[in-house]
UniProtKB/Swiss-Prot annotation:
This is Large ribosomal subunit protein bL33. InterPro entries: Ribosomal_bL33 (IPR001705), Ribosomal_bL33_CS (IPR018264), Ribosomal_bL33_sf (IPR038584), Ribosomal_zn-bd (IPR011332). It comes from Caulobacter vibrioides (strain NA1000 / CB15N) (Caulobacter crescentus). The keyword Ribosomal protein applies. GO terms for cellular component: cytosolic large ribosomal subunit. One of its GO terms (biological process) is translation. Belongs to the bacterial ribosomal protein bL33 family. Keywords: Ribonucleoprotein, Ribosomal protein.
Length: 55
């Protein structure tokens, strides 16, 4: 069987609240670490979320 093109990643909040999003990305075309600005409901602000591994 072929290896899937998309992998699941965890986007961790840089505000150190412990909040995270789980999303998918194409590992073949997006080789760098993903950084997105999203909403953190714990502090009720938009902050950067950085890619981390799912345990």
């Amino acid at each position: 069987m072929a290896k899937p093109a998309s992998i699941k990643i965890r986007l961790n909040s840089t505000a150190d609240t412990g909040f995270f999003y789980v999303t998918k990305k194409n590992a073949r075309t997006k080789t760098e670490k993903m950084v997105l600005k999203k909403y953190d409901p714990v502090i009720r602000k938009h902050v950067e979320f950085r890619e981390g591994k799912i345990k």
